[in-house]
């Protein structure tokens, strides 16, 4: 059951990242008005994610993998909320958003597979490790498909027209879908993960106490 909870948390986190990925072209072109910079923004985002991967590994050693993942979700929320307040011509501010959200992406690429590997090893589920990793890959791909199924009809219902003049309501819907909905999903993911950490601690502590008692020397003959 814990494996499926971790997969659900990962799914929420990936869905939060996938919605902006689906809408980024619309956001940059139709809201920011800087279509010519789309490629540079994407490059900045992915380079930030790749460069952050060693940093997240180091942080996971210092703080713990689950704790580091919680922190990365909060960092992603900071980036997404910042994007909500942007408007036409705010390309420098959006570049900062790309860096911040890219840094958070590095954690999503690094930590979940490692956390799942630790879980498999701790619970002696090595016989099912292939299935678990296959599910991890499936969840990532399904999240992208689900993001398209949610975001695009939502924009269409609000009257948003790509590459055209749009009403304030349509652009506001775009901002909400691009920034606030992912923020809510990331916060939910962080909350579930934090709850998982709290539930895991008593068992870990008990295990350490039990292990210590088993190795305590006996005073009986």
Feature names for model-found ranges:
Residues 1-221:
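Membrane-embedded alpha-helical bundles of multi-pass transporters/translocases
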């Amino acid at each position: 059951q814990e494996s499926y909870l971790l997969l659900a948390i990962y799914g929420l986190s990936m869905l939060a990242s996938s919605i902006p990925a689906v809408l980024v072209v619309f956001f940059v072109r139709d809201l920011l008005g800087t279509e010519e910079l789309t490629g540079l923004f994407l490059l900045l985002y992915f380079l930030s994610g790749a460069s952050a991967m060693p940093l997240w590994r180091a942080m996971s050693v210092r703080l713990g993998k689950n704790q580091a993942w919680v922190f990365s979700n909060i960092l992603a929320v900071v980036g997404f909320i910042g994007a909500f307040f942007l408007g036409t011509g705010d390309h420098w501010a959006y570049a900062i958003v790309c860096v911040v959200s890219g840094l958070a992406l590095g954690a999503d690429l690094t930590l979940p597979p490692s956390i799942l590997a630790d879980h498999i090893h701790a619970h002696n589920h090595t016989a099912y490790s292939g299935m678990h990793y296959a599910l991890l890959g499936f969840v990532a791909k399904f999240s992208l498909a689900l993001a398209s199924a949610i975001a695009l009809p939502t924009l269409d219902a609000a009257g948003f027209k790509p590459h055209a003049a749009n009403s304030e309501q349509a652009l506001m819907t775009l901002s909400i879908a691009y920034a606030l909905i992912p923020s809510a999903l990331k916060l939910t993911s962080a909350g579930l993960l934090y709850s998982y950490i709290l539930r895991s601690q008593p068992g870990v502590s008990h295990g350490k106490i039990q292990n210590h008692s088993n190795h305590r020397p006996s005073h009986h003959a």
